[in-house]
Amino acid sequence: MSKLRLKIGIISLSFMSMSALVVTNAYSAIIADFPNEPIAKIQMIGTIPSLGSLITTLFVGVLAMKCPKKILALFGILLTAIGGLVPIFFHSSINLLLGFALILGIGIGFMNTLSPMLLSEYFEGEERAGLMGIGTAITSLGSVVMMLGGGLLGASNWQNTYYIFLITILIFLLVLINLPMDKIIQKRRLIKRASPP
């Protein structure tokens, strides 16, 4: 696999890093649709993903030693898609939206944790530092695209804001095609061989 494809596969994970903020575009419309719900509770839709991401960081490192990072990355993107797209169809209560926001945060947590891990695994020195800089730029670009796109889509109906998460399909395909599969079994064998008798 070429280095360019590998870089694309890893860097693309950074695009969704700030995507949980998309729903903040729709706060006023959601508040109007749920007048009996506390405003603070509605605002949690944009903040609870951070809790999901925090939870994820606690165990992704352990999972990465037992499961290929590519599988974990694809799983994270899938969770992000579920948390971001299902609310288009199921949005009858704030509790539902909060649940999907938590799932969204967990998915984002997978991607945010795995991206630097993969860069450290496949690249070294100045090349790694340069790619981390590019990753930061992609994160900023993704934030702008997601916020702007979500705002435009949700102009007439706040539920349409979530359509911006269709971008996860593209990210999923980029990772699926360009990121190599980790050989976890081989790593275990090497560790076993290196162990003293």
Locations of the language-model features?
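Conserved MFS/SLC helix-loop-helix module at the cytosolic interface between two early adjacent transmembrane helices
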Residues: 55-94
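Membrane-interface helix termini in secondary transporters
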Residues: 29, 58-62, 152
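Helix-loop-helix hairpin linking two adjacent transmembrane segments in secondary transporters
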Residues: 134-180
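Cytoplasmic helix-loop-helix junction between adjacent transmembrane helices
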Residues: 102-138
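Small-residue-rich segments within alpha-helical transmembrane domains of MFS-like 12-TM solute carriers
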Residues: 17, 21, 105-113, 144
